[in-house]
């Protein structure tokens, strides 16, 4: 029978529930348990696919093509389990399914209500996502007290009642502030958030206290007394230099022993050797490189969360401190293409994105990298931008652009994909009038790499599988002209469309761009060959 750990948060948002939940999962996995994780989002959007990065941060894409919360990226980076669309659902999906059942007549004319119909659907989805695992860690998005979260909290209250205390555990994350003017740690916010939980029938078994300093023993006793939680189950979650220090930090306070005792799990002791090696590598780099990330969401770096982590992973595996400088592509555009801020950079990266804002600034960055032999990595839109720059400045295609930015451009070297074959062999079609939500080329797709290409050398294989999230693609009608001008198509899709997947420049020290998102499959234990190669290229450029 699957055991459930429910992780909730109180007082304020952005405390790090996802990191805490993933750290617990990593510790339990090191004890020999088969662990999965679920994220329940209370917003009414069906998924975050159409949400602004400034509103939501990064959209993480799963292997099976679900557009999900960025916390699923943390889950995959912390445990050896691949997330699917079953590992994430929102209020929008729950209501969508319940209403569809009502329209079919599945409720036999009954009045459809939050209890039991919505809560039953939530429980059904939790059990579905947890099936086959020893332990499922379920993170409830939002903050206890939010009206949107109530159906989810009621559902897990019912699960505790139905499954019992030895099969369910509630871990609540709270904020314990330090008031500098008074020189005191304040526990009152934590007392109030637990009071809020108790009002809806939830008693925390573990309190994880988010703090910027170690908790004094008397404050721990005070929280335990007022919140009716064992003193040893008051666990501190302190500020650390790297999120990968969190599993060891929580383990050192005995959190996994509390969990295994309550859930009656007879398992081996935790072995966090791999995590200690990761932390040691982060804390003891032998080299330093500066990488410019040129994008338009740089005011909220959470928009590039997986990408930032992938570069850090490459740093771990090359013993390098990767220092990222975020460059606003729109500022380059406004300053007439001034890229002087790139001159001290060892490499340049242009990430994915949507829309025309800041595009010419990105093109200027690509031009600088190409003309000055600076290592360049383009991802998704970053590949399309590189191709547009090459088409304009090298192949002589005047007016080269993407129809995403200019529907009537003279040379549409990038255009809307109107038809493609998915990984399972089915064919999808789109046009300009299609809905935006869930209509892109999504999830893992097969890619064939050209023998002898930089792509094949990086991956050490002629066939790879990478995740995608895009609506526009290289226009194959222009490929012959671009190849004649020297561009190398290093990878194409394995389907009948032979869509361009990677491009490279043979007479450049290291210039590579891909249509897919390799950052979604990087983790600190293994890294990713593409990012490792990119950081090595940056190191070589620095030495040169």
Swiss-Prot record:
Where, by residue number, does UTP bind? 13, 186-191, 222
Query: Which PROSITE patterns is this protein grouped with?
Result: GATASE_TYPE_1
User: Would the keyword ATP-binding be found if you checked this record's keyword annotation?
Assistant: yes
Binding locations of Mg(2+): 71, 139
| Activity: how regulated | Allosterically activated by GTP, when glutamine is the substrate; GTP has no effect on the reaction when ammonia is the substrate. The allosteric effector GTP functions by stabilizing the protein conformation that binds the tetrahedral intermediate(s) formed during glutamine hydrolysis. Inhibited by the product CTP, via allosteric rather than competitive inhibition.
User: What NCBIfam families is this protein classified in?
Assistant: PRK05380.1, PyrG
Q: Quaternary form?
A: Homotetramer.
Annotated region (Amidoligase domain) at 1-265
What residues does the Glutamine amidotransferase type-1 domain cover?
290-544
Q: Which GO terms describe its cellular component?
A: cytosol
Other comments on record: CTPSs have evolved a hybrid strategy for distinguishing between UTP and CTP. The overlapping regions of the product feedback inhibitory and substrate sites recognize a common feature in both compounds, the triphosphate moiety. To differentiate isosteric substrate and product pyrimidine rings, an additional pocket far from the expected kinase/ligase catalytic site, specifically recognizes the cytosine and ribose portions of the product inhibitor.
* Pfam families in the cross-refs: CTP_synth_N, GATase
Q: So, what pathway does this thing act in? A: Pyrimidine metabolism; CTP biosynthesis via de novo pathway; CTP from UDP: step 2/2
| Function comment | Catalyzes the ATP-dependent amination of UTP to CTP with either L-glutamine or ammonia as the source of nitrogen. Regulates intracellular CTP levels through interactions with the four ribonucleotide triphosphates.
Q: Which reaction does it catalyse?
A: UTP + L-glutamine + ATP + H2O = CTP + L-glutamate + ADP + phosphate + 2 H(+); L-glutamine + H2O = L-glutamate + NH4(+); UTP + NH4(+) + ATP = CTP + ADP + phosphate + 2 H(+)
List the SUPFAM superfamilies hit by this protein, alphabetically: Class I glutamine amidotransferase-like, P-loop containing nucleoside triphosphate hydrolases
Top-rank EC class of the record's enzyme = ligase
Task: State the Gene Ontology BP annotations.
Answer: 'de novo' CTP biosynthetic process; pyrimidine nucleobase biosynthetic process
Where do the annotations place CTP binding? 13, 146-148, 186-191, 222
The name of this protein is CTP synthase
**Which residues does the entry assign to the active site, renumbered to this chain?**
380 (nucleophile), 517, 519
**Where is L-glutamine annotated to bind?**
353, 381-384, 404, 471
The record's annotation in InterPro entries points to: Class_I_gatase-like, CTP_synthase, CTP_synthase_N, GATASE, GATase1_CTP_Synthase, P-loop_NTPase
Residues that bind ATP: 14-19, 71
Family from the record:
Belongs to the CTP synthase family.
Q: Which GO terms describe its molecular function?
A: ATP binding; CTP synthase activity; glutaminase activity; identical protein binding; metal ion binding
């Amino acid at each position: 029978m699957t055991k459930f750990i429910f992780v909730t948060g109180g007082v304020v948002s952005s405390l790090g529930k996802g990191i805490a939940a993933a750290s617990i999962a990593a510790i339990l996995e090191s004890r020999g348990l088969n662990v999965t994780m679920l994220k329940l989002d209370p917003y009414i959007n069906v998924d975050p696919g159409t949400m602004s990065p400034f509103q939501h941060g990064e959209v993480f894409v799963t292997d099976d093509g679900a557009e999900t919360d960025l916390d699923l990226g943390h889950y995959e980076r912390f445990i050896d389990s691949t997330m699917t669309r079953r590992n994430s659902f929102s209020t929008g999906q729950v209501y969508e399914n319940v209403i569809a059942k009502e329209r079919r007549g599945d409720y036999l004319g009954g009045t459809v209500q939050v209890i039991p119909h919505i809560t039953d659907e939530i429980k059904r989805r939790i059990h579905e996502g947890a099936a086959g695992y020893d332990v499922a860690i379920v993170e409830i998005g939002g903050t206890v007290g939010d009206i949107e979260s109530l159906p989810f909290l009621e559902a897990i209250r019912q699960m505790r009642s139905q499954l019992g205390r030895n099969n369910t555990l509630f871990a609540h994350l709270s904020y314990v502030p330090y008031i500098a003017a008074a020189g005191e740690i304040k526990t009152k916010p934590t007392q109030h958030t637990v009071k809020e939980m108790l009002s809806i029938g939830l008693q925390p078994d573990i309190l994880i206290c988010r703090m910027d300093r170690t908790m004094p023993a008397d404050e721990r006793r005070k929280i335990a007394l007022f919140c009716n939680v064992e003193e040893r189950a008051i666990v501190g979650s302190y500020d650390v230099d790297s999120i990968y220090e969190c599993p060891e930090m929580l383990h050192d306070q005995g959190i996994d022993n509390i969990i295994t005792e309550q859930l009656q799990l007879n398992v081996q002791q935790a072995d966090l050797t791999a995590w200690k090696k990761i932390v040691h590598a982060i804390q003891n780099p032998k080299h330093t490189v500066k990488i410019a990330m040129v994008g338009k969401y740089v005011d909220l770096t959470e928009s590039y969360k997986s990408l930032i982590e992938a570069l850090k992973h490459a740093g771990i595996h090359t013993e390098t401190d990767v220092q990222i400088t975020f460059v606003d592509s729109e500022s380059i555009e406004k300053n007439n293409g001034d890229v002087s801020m790139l001159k001290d950079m060892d490499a340049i990266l242009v990430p994915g994105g949507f829309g025309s804002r800041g595009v010419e600034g990105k093109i200027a960055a690509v031009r600088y990298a190409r003309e000055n032999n600076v290592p360049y990595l383009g991802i998704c839109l970053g590949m399309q931008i590189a191709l547009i720059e090459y088409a304009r400045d090298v192949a002589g295609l005047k007016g080269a652009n993407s129809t995403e930015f200019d529907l009537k451009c003279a040379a549409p070297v990038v255009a809307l994909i109107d038809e493609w074959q998915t990984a399972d062999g089915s064919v999808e079609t789109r046009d300009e009038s299609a809905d935006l939500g869930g209509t892109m080329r999504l999830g893992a797709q097969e890619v064939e790499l050209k023998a002898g290409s930089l792509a094949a050398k990086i991956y050490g294989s002629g066939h790879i599988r990478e995740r995608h999230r895009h609506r526009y693609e290289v226009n194959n009608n222009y490929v012959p002209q671009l190849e004649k001008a020297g561009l190398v198509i290093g990878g194409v899709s394995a389907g009948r469309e032979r869509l361009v997947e990677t491009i490279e420049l043979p007479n450049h020290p290291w210039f590579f761009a891909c249509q897919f998102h390799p950052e979604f499959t990087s983790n600190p234990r293994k890294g990713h060959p593409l990012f490792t190669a990119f950081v090595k290229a940056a190191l070589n450029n620095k030495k040169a």
